[in-house]
Amino acid sequence: MIVGAAGRVGSSLARSFPEATCLKRGDLDVGDPCTVARFGWSRDDVVLNAAGYTDVDAAQSRAGSAAAWRTNHVGAANLAQAAIRHRFVLLHLSTDYVFSGRTTGAISEDAPVDPLNVYGESKAAGDSEVARTPRHYIVRTSWVVGEGENFVRRMLRLAHAGQRPTIVDDQFGRLTFADDLCAAIRHLVVHRPAFGTYNVTNDGTPATWAAIARKVFIAAGRRDEDVSGRTTREFLAEFPKKAERPLNSVLDLGKARGVGIELHDWEPRLKEYLERELTR
């Protein structure tokens, strides 16, 4: 069963698991404990939780914060209780935003969480609820490129519109393409390595958002210099209501590799993605 099947990753999971029952929010509101408790879970051996409130900046507002905590923490807790009661495997999607990104080097699964914003706080709290279940996978990922709006599509639009954007150039990470993330999730579900937390992103040399934007612009026929860089500090000074982001979002992929998950380099995947987008 896929919960949150209409979202950026959920819709990709639905394609990757055609045999699954797909639930959208109208089918199951994970934030409502009574609804989750009454749901007919006994038929399902594995539940993939892709439900999440992911508007990082809106989560800083009062209404957004309430929505983030309701879905990301309370929703995860409700599913965790159902997993214990009905003994199904719960696979839960997490994020690099549970970390501050103030350390250097790749971040391991057992690094202490230290979120910088409400979204990260709510996700970290949800992770801790899922971790209490005996049969769980927490899949931490970052910088997802999937269905609907994403950074690469936004940069393509700017490139085609003749814009010259200024993009943050001191946050490092790797893109994660949704299809590759879903393939890794299928590997966990099918092969059942040890339960626990796994970092899953695309592999390759980390880059900044500005560096990725320049690659997109070049693919669209523009030039490197059409994308300017700036620091996160400068960005937040201009947009003080935006949520603070980690400077280091590079996740250690050793554990995932160790259980046989194939992790493709993000740069060839970006090239393939852009070729598809540019011929649409």
Positions of PLM-derived features:
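Active-site loop of classical SDR/Rossmann-like NAD(P)-dependent oxidoreductases
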Residues: 8, 208-209, 232-254, 265
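C-terminal amphipathic/interface module of NAD(P)-dependent oxidoreductases
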Residues: 244-280
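NAD(P)-dependent short-chain dehydrogenase/reductase
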Residues: 131-180
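Mid/C-terminal beta-alpha module of Rossmann-like enzyme folds, strongest
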Residues: 191-241, 274
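NAD(P)H-binding glycine-rich loop region in Rossmannoid oxidoreductase-like domains
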Residues: 33-73, 84
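Adenosine-cofactor binding site in Rossmann-like domains, unifying the SAM/SAH pocket
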Residues: 18-38
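N-terminal Rossmann NAD(P)H-binding glycine-rich loop of SDR-like oxidoreductase domains
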Residues: 1-18
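Catalytic helix-loop patch of NAD(P)-dependent Rossmann-fold dehydrogenases
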Residues: 70, 74-75, 85, 98-139, ...
